[in-house]
Every structure is written in structure tokens, then in C-alpha cells.
């Protein structure tokens, strides 16, 4: 039976694979697993029940799914603070700020509106390790907690959830944004009610698109996966910069004044150099994934910043950061984690600090983005192959080594087998697009030949 939890919680078609029954069951299982710690026991010792935060993005299905989650928790003896529609990083912050035992976010992030998901955070607002998710999944089929009478949980509105998060974001800023004109694309998502307020309070002149969520238009032609509209809006408004969020606002991508995209790698480069200059980049180290652009690594090396690589996924970036106390990490996709202020990727926080660097250095985004050269990166997906043998086939390994030798210090090769299907991703970076395309296709042919299913 396939694992229920994916790389970012449980996701599926709302009311299809992800039903109210499953949401309720997951909440009950989470309650059984996550209330065994000292914090929950200390609450019980003084006559209090364990506490959880529940929140959601504005998808129409989020209403019944979050209600099912809250019901599952309360029926297990957990007091629930319902924060309503807020960004995922806001929920993570509130779990820590309110000293809750854990929390649940109902969102499918950048996925289309018919999908939804359930993401569970541990005490402190951190993502759950795989082993804890496995225990929750096992508990779906075990006996649930069944308190009665005064021992059942209460559900109440978390009335000042947004205000707490907004004040936290503003307090994190090292420099105000006065004089900067920004276009915000809120993806018709969870950022629509918060991001414009925060950027305005920080001093920026704000134009907003994608700020009218109706439950079904989340990520629909807007947000961090659809940057064309934001680029057009930046040019039309004559703005200095554009900031794009995704549906739950845990990502940030940017557009410069000329309409060019500034991706997560470039944002990390800008923030890392600024933090190093201000003495805030712990151990002069940046955590990135194996998919981050070669240009990021070269630029950081030249600036005296060490880059530590992890597997793809912000959870692995965060594990590395937490394990060694690093202060900055992220992904090319725009998940950027600033651990001094957040326990997960925070698109609003990232955008604020990016604009803060523009204001502090009195430079345009295009000027700051010159901190790194973006190498052409070509990805070819090879399907229907034995992906388990990708690192053991000798002739394939020789072909990879030959391409690496030809590229030298001006490129790199990465073969990534899928964890869920017979697919191998062939990625090549080179100094020019033509070389990257040619070598990626050549290697893809070798993969097909050697690993044919």
C-alpha cells in the first residue's frame, strides 16, 4: 500500500481521495501520536487539555476539511484554536508563538483549486519527521482517543491570529521599504488579506493583483507558477519590483523593473550576501538543494560563503539548517527559510527582506540579481525505465563522467530517479543553452538504452 504522506503532507482531490472522513481520522491519529510529549502532559497535570492550531487557505473545500480536522481533534480531547484563512508560515509561527502542542494546515499550496491537503506541524511549528508521519499513518487503523464529558476539547476562533503574524513580520525587518513601488501577486490565496497590509505598513507603495479569492480561483493563472501576469503588471505600473506568492504563501519569486524573473536561487544569493555583510549569516553558510543553479554555488564561493547541499525538498533544507544552526536556506522554486524568524518557507517574509536589501543598498533588483550568473539548466524526463539502477549501471556512469569532463568547471550533471514512478530526470547545466540541450539529450538517450524497462 503506498505511503499516505507525501513530501509535503497528505494531498489529493478534495472529496475524492481526500475526504472529510480521512481528514477527521488523520486528526484523531495525530492527536494520539502528538500528545504524548512533556508539554501535553504538563497541561494535563494542571487540569488543561492539549492545544492545537488549525488553519486553511481559501479553497472552498478547506471549509469542510478544516471543520473535519477540528472535529477530529476536539473529539480526541484537544482544544482547538481555529485561525481561519492564513498563510502556511503564519500557522507555523502561531504554533510556536502560542506554545501549542501541534497544528494542522489545510492547503494544497500551488496546486489547482480542486485539490487540497493536510499538513501537520509539530510543537514549535516545525515539519514532522518521516518517522512521526509513519506513526500517525499507522494510528489511522488503531483505536482512537475517546474522552467524554468535560474531557472533550473546545473549538474557538483565534481572533488575533493575523495581527500576531503581521507584527512578527514587521518586527523582523532590518530596514524600511520607503520609496519602493511593489506589485504583489497574492495568487487569490492565503496572502491576499495579509501581504498588502504588511508591505504597506513597512513603507512600500503597493499595487495588488490576485487578491480576490473566491474559493475556486486560487493559483488560476496567477501566483508564483504563472509569472507572466505579474511581469505585465510591473511594466504597466512602472513599478520597481514584483513579488509573487503561491496559494498558501510559503513561496516567493520576484520580477524586476524590466519584467525579468528573479528565482529562488537569485533571491537566496541576494539575501546571503546581505546577511553576511550585516553579520547575520550564521557560519557564513547557505543551505541549498542539489537542484540549485551552479551559478549560485560559484557566486557564493567567490564571496566566501559555503554552500551545503541537500536532497530536493524544503523539509530536507530545514533539517540541515536545524541540525547545524544555519540561518538561511531554500530552493530554486522560491521556498526560502530564514530560521531567525521562521520555521518554514515564508513568501511574505522573504519578499519583505528582499525589498529591505534593495532599500538598504539603494540598488534596483536587477542590480542585486547580478550577484550570480544563472547558468542555462535543461531537464529531460526519461519515462518507462528502471529508475532503481540509475546509479549502478557502469556504462551510464561512464557516460556521465564523460559529459562532466567535457563541461569542466563550466557545468554539471545530475541524474535523479523518481521515488514514485519509473522515471529518471536528467539535468545538465552548461555555459550556453545549446550545449546544455545537446548534452542533456545525449545522456537521456543513454539512460533509455541502458535502463530500458
Curated annotation (Swiss-Prot):
Enzyme Commission number(s): 5.4.2.10
Gene3D superfamilies: Alpha-D-Glucose-1,6-Bisphosphate, subunit A, domain 3 (3.40.120.10), Alpha-D-phosphohexomutase, C-terminal domain (3.30.310.50)
Modified residues (Phosphoserine): 109
Keyword line: Isomerase, Magnesium, Metal-binding, Phosphoprotein
Keyword Zinc-finger: no
EC top class, as a word: isomerase
Pfam families named among the record's database cross-references: PGM_PMM_I, PGM_PMM_II, PGM_PMM_III, PGM_PMM_IV
Description of post-translational modifications: Activated by phosphorylation.
Keyword hit for Isomerase: yes
Functional description taken from the UniProt entry: Catalyzes the conversion of glucosamine-6-phosphate to glucosamine-1-phosphate.
Similarity comment: Belongs to the phosphohexose mutase family.
Protein known as: Phosphoglucosamine mutase
Provenance organism: Leifsonia xyli subsp. xyli (strain CTCB07)
Gene name of the record: glmM
Amino acid at each position: 500500500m503506498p505511503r499516505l504522506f507525501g513530501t509535503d503532507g497528505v494531498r489529493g482531490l478534495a472529496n475524492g481521495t481526500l475526504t472529510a472522513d480521512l481528514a477527521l481520522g488523520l486528526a484523531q491519529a495525530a492527536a494520539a501520536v502528538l500528545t504524548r510529549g512533556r508539554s501535553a502532559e504538563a497541561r494535563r497535570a494542571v487540569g488543561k487539555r492539549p492545544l492545537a492550531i488549525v488553519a486553511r487557505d481559501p479553497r472552498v473545500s478547506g471549509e469542510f476539511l478544516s471543520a473535519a480536522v477540528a472535529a477530529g481533534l476536539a473529539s480526541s480531547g484537544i482544544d482547538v484554536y481555529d485561525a481561519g484563512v492564513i498563510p502556511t508560515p503564519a500557522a507555523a509561527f502561531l504554533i510556536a508563538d502560542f506554545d501549542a502542542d501541534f497544528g494542522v494546515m489545510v492547503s494544497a499550496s500551488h496546486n489547482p483549486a480542486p485539490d487540497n491537503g493536510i499538513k501537520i506541524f509539530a510543537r514549535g511549528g516545525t515539519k514532522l519527521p518521516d518517522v512521526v508521519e509513519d506513526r500517525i499513518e499507522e494510528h489511522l487503523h488503531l483505536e482512537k482517543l475517546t474522552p467524554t464529558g468535560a474531557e472533550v476539547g473546545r473549538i474557538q476562533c483565534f481572533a488575533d491570529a493575523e495581527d500576531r503574524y503581521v507584527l512578527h513580520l514587521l518586527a523582523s525587518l532590518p530596514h524600511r521599504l520607503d520609496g519602493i513601488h511593489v506589485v504583489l501577486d497574492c495568487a487569490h490565496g492565503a496572502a491576499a488579506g495579509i501581504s498588502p497590509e504588511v508591505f504597506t505598513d513597512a513603507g512600500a507603495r503597493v499595487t495588488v493583483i490576485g487578491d480576490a479569492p473566491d474559493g475556486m480561483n486560487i493559483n488560476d493563472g496567477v501566483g508564483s507558477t504563472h509569472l507572466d501576469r505579474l511581469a505585465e503588471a510591473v511594466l504597466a505600473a512602472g513599478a520597481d519590483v514584483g513579488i509573487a506568492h503561491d496559494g498558501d504563501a510559503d513561496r516567493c519569486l520576484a520580477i524586476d523593473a524590466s519584467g525579468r524573473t528573479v528565482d529562488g536561487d537569485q533571491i537566496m544569493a541576494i539575501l546571503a550576501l546581505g546577511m553576511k555583510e550585516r553579520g547575520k549569516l550564521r557560519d557564513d553558510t547557505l543551505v541549498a538543494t542539489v537542484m540549485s543553479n551552479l551559478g549560485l554555488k560559484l557566486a557564493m564561493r567567490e564571496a566566501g560563503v559555503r554552500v551545503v547541499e541537500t536532497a530536493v525538498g524544503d523539509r530536507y533544507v530545514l533539517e540541515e539548517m536545524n541540525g547545524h544552526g544555519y540561518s538561511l536556506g531554500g530552493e530554486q522554486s522560491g521556498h526560502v527559510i530564514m530560521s531567525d524568524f521562521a520555521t518554514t518557507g515564508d513568501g511574505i517574509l522573504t519578499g519583505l527582506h528582499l525589498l529591505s536589501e534593495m532599500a538598504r543598498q539603494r540598488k534596483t533588483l536587477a542590480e542585486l540579481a547580478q550577484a550570480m550568473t544563472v547558468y542555462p539548466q535543461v531537464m529531460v524526463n526519461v519515462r518507462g525505465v528502471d529508475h532503481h539502477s540509475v546509479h549502478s549501471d557502469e556504462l551510464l556512469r561512464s557516460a556521465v563522467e564523460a559529459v562532466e569532463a567535457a563541461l569542466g568547471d563550466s557545468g554539471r550533471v545530475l541524474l535523479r530517479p523518481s521515488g514514485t514512478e519509473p522515471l529518471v530526470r536528467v539535468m545538465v547545466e552548461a555555459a550556453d543553452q545549446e550545449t546544455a540541450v545537446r548534452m542533456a539529450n545525449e545522456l537521456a538517450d543513454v539512460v533509455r538504452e541502458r535502463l530500458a524497462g
